[in-house]
């Protein structure tokens, strides 16, 4: 809870800072808004990627699943993928596949969290960028995201693949 408050304070300070920058033309105003979104997304990426595995209801379960996938063969991954998407049996076959592919590059769960956070918040930042016109709109969107506790969604949403 304190972290979310800190994120909101940093987002508010960032909104104040980027709003105070010269924006004599729409292009400059747009650049300031874009830089503010990047600033906030970096904060949200760090919030998500640096959390402890005990934070959130599902993070530890996802950690255990990540460790389990290390011991799972590629054949089992593909059989599970086929049974879910071809035969319609089971669920969430994409998530183990993404984990297994990621583990070709790194077996560190923290790096995986960072990877997921970058993908999620880059997409969220792009969405906010396309749907807002002013820095104040961006702040409201980020505040709603934080206040409604959607900050957990960056990892649990990926598990729905």
Task: Give the ranges of each region predicted by the language model.
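Short hydrophobic/aromatic helix or loop-helix immediately within or flanking a transmembrane segment
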Residues: 60, 64-71, 77-107
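Start-transfer (signal-anchor) and selected internal transmembrane alpha helices
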Residues: 1-44
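Extracytoplasmic loop-helix module adjacent to an early transmembrane segment
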Residues: 34-35, 39-41, 48-76
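Hydrophobic membrane-targeting alpha-helices
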Residues: 17-18, 49, 101, 127-131
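Hydrophobic alpha-helical transmembrane segments of multi-pass membrane proteins
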Residues: 46, 50-53, 111-119, 155, ...
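Membrane-interface starts of transmembrane alpha-helices
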Residues: 28-39, 104-115, 137
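Transmembrane-helix motifs of polytopic, lipid-linked glycan transferases
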Residues: 115-132
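Membrane-embedded helix bundles of polyisoprenyl
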Residues: 137-161
């Amino acid at each position: 809870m304190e972290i979310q408050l800190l994120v909101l304070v940093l987002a508010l300070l960032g909104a104040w800072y980027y709003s105070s920058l010269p924006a004599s033309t729409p292009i400059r105003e747009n650049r300031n808004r874009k830089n503010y979104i990047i600033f906030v997304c970096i904060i949200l990426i760090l919030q998500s990627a640096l959390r402890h595995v005990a934070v959130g209801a599902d993070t530890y379960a996802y950690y255990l699943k990540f460790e389990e996938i290390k011991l799972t063969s590629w054949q089992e991954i593909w059989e599970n993928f086929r049974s879910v998407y071809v035969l319609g049996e089971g669920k969430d076959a994409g998530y183990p596949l993404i984990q297994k592919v990621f583990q070709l590059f790194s077996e560190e769960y923290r790096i995986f969290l960072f990877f997921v956070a970058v993908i999620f918040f880059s997409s969220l930042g792009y969405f906010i960028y396309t749907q807002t016109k002013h820095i104040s709109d961006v702040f409201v969107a980020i505040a709603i995201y934080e206040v409604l506790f959607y900050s957990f969604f960056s990892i649990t949403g990926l598990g729905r693949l």
